[in-house]
Amino acid sequence: GIGINAGRIRGINSRIRGGEVQHTGVIPFLKKFEATVRCCTQNGVRGGSATVHFPIWHQEIEDILVLKNNKGTEDNRVRKLDYSIQISKLFYERFIKNEDITLFSPHDAPGLYDAFGMPEFDDLYLKYEKDKSIPKSTIGAQELFMDLLKERAETGRIYIMNIDHCNTHSSFKDKVNMSNLCQEITLPTKPIQHIDDKEGEIALCILSAVNLGLLTDIDELEELCDLSVRALDEIIDYQEYPVEAAKISTLARRSLGIGFIGLAHYLAKNQVNYESKAAAKLVDKVSEAFQFYLLKASNNLAKEKSKCLWFEKTKYSDGILPIDTYKNCLLYTSP
């Protein structure tokens, strides 16, 4: 399964070469993605999957939101893909204030897509809203959010990605533009112009998980995290890379995604109700230990093998750790 960033695709009927040609919009491209994904299966049993990312301000967002539902026709639906709608604080504020959201074709608003998720986005967005020379349309923020939530509830496969928070809390100095299939990994990416392009960047998920349900003591995490980090780091060097843009960035960043499973089992073993405040405190405690031991293992590995090639491109190189952007006020807001 893969993540696809389609947010740069022009909106339907956008002018090309000064109006000489009009763009066909996102749906024909999504049809192509869908066909490509479906031709890849594991022994004919498990098919390929993809999640496609779009900004909430995209010109075709209203049509994008309904692409998975069982209404419409095969011509205007792309049901075999999943979708991630990217939102930032500005749009939540407009929802709260019952204001409008202005929709753009990315090509008509230069730099807007590149700024999305970064501090400079808001000023640029407001500037383009006032520019009468740029094609645009508006929709009520509450109407659009309700449509998003309705389709999310009915299809179960439309995700919400808070793109500004992904960058604020990211470990990277490079911008995060998208996520992966399941939305748990956020790594920097750059478009490739051809299959041998060495300037682009394709992010790979190097993943494993620790089963918390089997723990008898939280201190056992130290050895488990160390083993996980070392095993995955070996895989990075061992595996083959058919695409240069994936090989270069993976070897240079050496990003690992190590999570935990069996959380409900772990809470039950500790006689904690899943929805209680005590559960939130326990999850915070085990997550903090988990993160600490993973960082410790990574540091020990760097002492043995030297730091990764692109270490200076991370916030770690400036002494900024995940806990430094963590908001304590959110910890005890669970019901």
Question: Can you name each region flagged by the protein language model?
Answer:
Residues 18-32, 42-48, 53-172, 260-323:
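Conserved, charged catalytic cores of large soluble enzymes
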Residues 1-18, 26-29, 39-43, 151-250, ...:
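Function-dense linear segments that define catalytic or interfacial modules
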